[in-house]
Amino acid sequence: MKKALLALSFVLCATLAMAQYRNKDGNRIGITGGVSQTSLFNSNFVTKPGIGFNGGLSVRGNYYNNWSMIYGMQFFQNKFSIETTTSSLQKKESEFNIQGAQIRLLLSYNVVKNHVSFDFGPVLQINDKLKTANSDQNNTITGTNLKAVQLEEISKVNGNVYVGISAGNRRIRAIVHYQYGFTNLLNKLNSEEDLVLLNNNTKFKGNLGTISGQLLFNL
């Protein structure tokens, strides 16, 4: 996982450097950072959204008339809670977190040039395991016979759809965007028949939905 993230970082940095070198006026390199709220949409568990964070780099280039393209990568940590039952039979919202990197290629329509844009496109997500606190790992997922720790091995490569809007000037912009995961984050769990049985003999299905607020600083 770490090697993959380092490779992705190298590719992005090299691409951004080349873009800036080739056309300093047409391309803008930006640094972003912000907070996110993530929900796990599924019919297996009782869940609640949680607060995470993200940050990364991007390059915006002129494309055609009022259209631009954005290529970027960001690192993220998303969080959400799943209702569990402790060994003392107490209900508890156990927090889970997922970390990884995303590569996105977006089309951007300049509603007001250099000030307001509408952005959309696909996102490739590479993430680590689904993790929870050591103290919660043996809690039972409400409505199932699963232990929290048994949800760790999720799908590592996922795809999202990105829709967002940004507003500001050439140097600083505020960004609000939403991502929906169109792939099944929990699909890898379906390869383990024992886990499916513990899940009431029901296939696992879960899609992430994340809304983020960010600040972008153009170099």
What are these regions (language model features)?
Residues 1-28, 32, 215-219:
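Bacterial Sec-dependent N-terminal signal peptides
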Residues 90-115:
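Helix-adjacent hinge/juxtasegments
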Residues 20, 116-121, 125-127, 175-179, ...:
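Membrane-proximal, glycine/serine-rich, low-complexity loop/turn segments characteristic
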Residues 39-48, 77-99, 126-162, 183-193, ...:
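Extracellular/periplasm-exposed beta-strand and loop segments of Gram-negative cell-envelope proteins
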Residues 31-35, 53-61, 73-75, 103-109, ...:
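Residues on the lipid-exposed face of transmembrane beta-strands in outer-membrane beta-barrel proteins
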Residues 47-89:
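Glycine- and aromatic-enriched membrane insertion/assembly motifs of diderm outer-membrane
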Residues 28-30, 68, 106, 115-117, ...:
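Membrane-spanning beta-strand positions in outer-membrane beta-barrel proteins
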